[in-house]
Amino acid sequence: MEANNQKKLEYPFSNRPKDGELLNVKGGIHWLRMPLPIALNHINLWLIEGNNGFTIIDSGMSTDEAKGIWRNIFNEFVSPKKVEKILITHMHLDHSGLAGWLSSELNIDPHFTQKEHNETQKIIGCLLYTSPSPRD
């Protein structure tokens, strides 16, 4: 349906991965549909295969289900030793929630922009150095 002369959104892929599954988009680009326990029921994550290993783009939300999906991927698709980088596009919890866990599991540091780092430091500072709001 078109409204206000806007075209309907068209998706470039007829096939979509099921929750927790990888779909090879093209070459070394793999699409991971990670389920979320909120109204937005999934997030799209990516594994990009390079010459020397894989880059994970975004981690998903910190849930036991998401950790299980990552463990399954490491057991069936890519050895943890083959992961070179973890890139976090932004610090929303659905994109960055498992960055620390993945970093620990893979023994590599996650990367994100300086702006996201600065904003996260501000939030942490507010949480650590301000009094909680009084409750009624």
Show the residue positions of the predicted features.
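Short glycine- and acidic-rich boundary segments immediately preceding or forming the N-terminal edge
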Residues: 11-17, 21
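Long, mid-chain structured domain cores
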Residues: 89, 125-128
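A short beta-to-alpha transition loop/helix N-cap that caps and shapes the active-site region
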Residues: 118-123
